[in-house]
Amino acid sequence: MLDLGNMSMSASVALTCCPSFLPAASGPELAKSINSPENLAGECNGKHLPMIPPEEEVKDIKIANGVTAFTRKQNPSDRVKKGFVLDDHVKDWVKRRVASGVSESTCFLPFLVGAKKMVDCLVCHKPVYPGEDLSCSVRGCQGAYHSLCAKESLGFSKSSKFKCPQHECFVCKQRTQWRCVKCPMAAHDKHSPWSKEILHLKDQPGRAVCWRHPTDWRLDTKHAVAQSEIEEVFCQLPLPYVEEEFKIDLAWKDSVVKEDPPSYVHIRRNIYLVKKKRDNANDGVGCTNCGPNCDRSCVCRVQCISCSKGCSCPESCGNRPFRKEKKIKIVKTEHCGWGVEAAESINKEDFIVEYIGEVISDAQCEQRLWDMKHKGMKDFYMCEIQKDFTIDATFKGNASRFLNHSCNPNCVLEKWQVEGETRVGVFAARQIEAGEPLTYDYRFVQFGPEVKCNCGSENCQGYLGTKRKEPNCLVVSWGAKRRRLFHRPIARKPQQD
């Protein structure tokens, strides 16, 4: 290793000065002479010149043993910078960050004294800065969210009534029965899409693992019964799950083709394609001893006759159906095509809707059936009331044409006389709740192939309608005698001489 100390003591080492070196001057004149253009343009071309501060920054120059030392003047602004505290530096940092385009709310240092404690958003799990937080309105809840996350992911916009998803059922928005310990899901068992797959924690009442976490479904289940067949063993093994949950783009919702009921012309009253018959036998005859409501003992009601002007009851009596229909809606069923559901609760014997369509004769009905057969149509909406009086709702009608058949129906069809006109109404056979399908017994005679019944009732007959019964012919032959199988012995008397 090179020894610099020995080199300095060696006599062979000669120190030479720069040819442009000038004699040392005293005071500020030295700085002027060194920084003069003549000296800077010397033979050294400034390569060997030291870094000399400007003249206005030189405070004092000391020369000792040919070595010149400069003392720099102290700037008053430097004294202020040396007196900076941490808050001043933080403010300066915030100012520079805001100038660069960063939001001032994000310029937040949680380690400072008195700073708010930062929490993570329960949706995106990123820090929530002051001014961007949306806190839960439930007392004692520490949940915090970004305003944007709560609006886009949870659908909340009002900060005053905001609640965490775990405080209410995601379906009925009422107080929850259980909360999931792994996600913000909360619900009741009856509102859960897979209630059997919810794992309720025994040691934590009100806590559970919801259906979103299939890997934990079998934590609390009992072992299955031992099987000897390899096929049964593989059937009981849980399937591997790669995706636990996925989201569907809302744009796909518009691309789904909405299925509508079969097209038909909606009408409010029957359209007669035959001569309209009017029964005038009951004109001028009505109830006389009924009260204002006309209960079941009403003479007109027993005969399925609507009260009219000839009755002594007022216009507001209860035996005037076909005036106000119940609220119903057309829905798509799982096994029976289109059907009708009750949109409100219906009491027993209440009028629901009138069965209307085109009134045709028997000849027209037969012709239409042949035409439908040639066209391949399988759905018929014909209701035969009496001779030459068939209501066909195939092309024109109302929602009653979609009522399905059931072997255990909750509705009945009744034929009434209203102001001398024959009309058919659908009445409730029992109490019907809202959302319950409306059905009645078709009672039709099947002449062609059998049609399977999908009503699902306990007393389902299996097939729609009944076949036409052929009479059993009893063949009687009066000429032939029946052969006896047993002979009774006859006692003979002895002959007398």
From Swiss-Prot:
Domain of life: Eukaryota
Post-SET domain location: 449-465
InterPro entries cross-referenced by the UniProt entry: ASHR3-like_SET, AWS_dom, Hist-Lys_N-MeTrfase_SET2_plant, Post-SET_dom, SET2_Histone-Lys_MeTrsfase, SET_dom, SET_dom_sf, Znf_PHD
Expression tissues: Expressed in roots, flowers and buds, the anther and in stamen filaments.
Keyword S-adenosyl-L-methionine annotated: yes
Coiled coil: none
One Pfam family recorded for the sequence: SET
Major location category of this protein: nucleus
Enzyme class (EC, first level): transferase
Any single GO BP term: methylation
Subunit structure, interactors included: Interacts with AMS/bHLH21 by its SET domain and PHD finger.
PANTHER family xref list: SET DOMAIN PROTEINS (PTHR22884)
Known role: Histone methyltransferase. Involved in stamen development.
Family indicated by similarity: Belongs to the class V-like SAM-binding methyltransferase superfamily. Histone-lysine methyltransferase family. SET2 subfamily.
Protein name per its UniProtKB record: Histone-lysine N-methyltransferase ASHR3
Underlying gene: ASHR3
